[in-house]
Amino acid sequence: TSHGGGKAGKSKLLDVNY
């Protein structure tokens, strides 16, 4: 959750990319 952080409640793993 460093970049965007919780993109529409995405998965925690994807939260990093999004």
Swiss-Prot record:
Glycosylated. One of its GO terms (biological process) is shell calcification. It comes from Unio pictorum (Painter's mussel). The keyword Calcium applies. One of its GO terms (molecular function) is calcium ion binding. On the 2D-gel the determined pI of this protein is: 4, its MW is: 95 kDa. The keyword DNA repair does not apply. This is Calcium-binding shell glycoprotein P95. Keywords: Calcium, Glycoprotein. It comes from the Eukaryota. Shell nacre. Calcium-binding. Transmembrane segments: none annotated.
